Amino acid sequence: MSHNNVTHGKPWSGRFHEPTDTFVEEFTASIGFDHRLYRQDIHGSIAHARMLAKVGVLSREECDAIIQGLETIAQDISRGQFSWSVALEDVHMNIEAALTERIGPVGKKLHTGRSRNDQIATDIRLYLRDAIDLITAQLQRLQEGLLAIAEREAATIMPGFTHLQTAQPVTFGHHLMAWFEMLLRDTGRLADCRHRVNVLPLGAAALAGTTFPIDRAYTAELLGFDGIAENSLDAVSDRDFAIEFTAAGALLMTHLSRFAEELVLWSSAQFDFITLPDRFCTGSSIMPQKKNPDVPELVRGKTGRVNGHLVSLLTLMKGQPLAYNKDNQEDKEPLFDTVDTLLGCLRAFADMIPAITTNPDKMREAATKGYATATDLADYLVRKGVSFRDAHEIVGKAVALAIEQSKDLAALKLATLQDFSPVIEEDVFDVLTLEGSVAARNHLGGTAPAQVRAAIQRGREKLNSLA
């Protein structure tokens, strides 16, 4: 019986006696999507080669040849001059095969002390680290746009809503600053996630570490990692960092989706609070008059993609024993699409928001409807010595009468108001104006224009501290 090695063209096929089924080869290959990790893969391989040379596993000449070969491969890929092979399965094997073809047998030494298990974990962490930085930059650009509009509209009065019903007057600047605060927390979540992403798995090898005298601290330094994974099994087994990122992305997209919903409402003829620039809208194939808010609608719709990716990754991991399993090949497409979706939606919003024009007269007119100053009247009664519950009852009856007469509270005569409570005096009309209502909420977090401007200043300081 012959014991000749039957390679079948695979780097792992020494123990196999027949080639991989053609369909299985295509079914199990990931090169169709993980090729986008080539920069990170080559960056990690160069650092690994330098570390191997430092500890004496590679000679300086071998290390230089490997690095030069990898750099030329990176150039070819970036120029579209590299052919990816399904037969070589993934980005790692494609690059390694090309390296060996170009520099000879020394290319086969690169994988010493390393497995694809810790290699892909390193690639993904490098990719996510870069992605978080790009996303954060777009997010901060959007926040800067919000601050600019909020400052311009710090005193623009609009109705505040609960249950989408008029509740109390607020300023448009105050409303926009609510979105700023939500996005600021999203920025913090991404920064916090980045700390846990920025941990080096390389050196864990397949699952148990390696017998070679590797210097993981040196590799971490070369790759800019803040920490080193301290358990080899954990390093290659978990994708919690990817799940955490996707969860942060889902929250961010949820905030964008809610904001998008308001933009759609506000830009409608029924609200007419804002006008979206034509360049961010589309028309109808049949209705000539239409100007559709497609950008915010798409952002709202794309939120479901990221939410779905979060569930996919959670489900992917929930039943896996330690250590690495082929299931984890399915982590990349949800992750890549989450990054692409976040970057696209944030860019669209960051470009669109500063270009929005407001219709202050329409906002103010809407705030005059729905008895938005009713709470101010109740507060007025409390300051006159009436308990809040009694004041609530009194004002409710006054509102009912105003509805009957199709009048605003401020349009009721003083004598009519005094019929509801004798403590009401002429000064009541000061609190029933929209401007008076807004100005009265002059405390930290309130909607008074002075407080809005102070919040904007604090917001700028927070953004500057993140730069």
UniProtKB/Swiss-Prot annotation:
The UniProt record lists the keyword Transferase: no
Functional pathway: Amino-acid biosynthesis; L-arginine biosynthesis; L-arginine from L-ornithine and carbamoyl phosphate: step 3/3
Top EC class, one word: lyase
Q: What is its EC number?
A: 4.3.2.1
Q: Where does this one sit in the cell?
A: Cytoplasm
Q: Which domain of life is it from?
A: Bacteria
UniProt-listed GO biological process terms = arginine biosynthetic process via ornithine; L-arginine biosynthetic process
One Pfam family in the UniProt entry: ASL_C2
Reactions mediated catalytically: 2-(N(omega)-L-arginino)succinate = fumarate + L-arginine
Q: Which UniProt keywords apply?
A: Amino-acid biosynthesis, Arginine biosynthesis, Cytoplasm, Lyase
Question: Coiled coil: which residue ranges?
Answer: none
GO MF terms held by the record: argininosuccinate lyase activity
Recorded hits in PROSITE patterns, A to Z, give: FUMARATE_LYASES
Q: Which GO terms describe its cellular component?
A: cytosol
Q: Which InterPro entries match?
A: Arg_succ_lyase_C (IPR029419), Argininosuccinate_lyase (IPR009049), Fumarase/histidase_N (IPR024083), Fumarate_lyase_CS (IPR020557), Fumarate_lyase_fam (IPR000362), Fumarate_lyase_N (IPR022761), L-Aspartase-like (IPR008948)
Q: Per its UniProt record, what HAMAP family does this chain match?
A: Arg_succ_lyase
Q: Which family does it belong to?
A: Belongs to the lyase 1 family. Argininosuccinate lyase subfamily.
Protein's UniProt name: Argininosuccinate lyase
Native organism is: Nitrosococcus oceani (strain ATCC 19707 / BCRC 17464 / JCM 30415 / NCIMB 11848 / C-107)
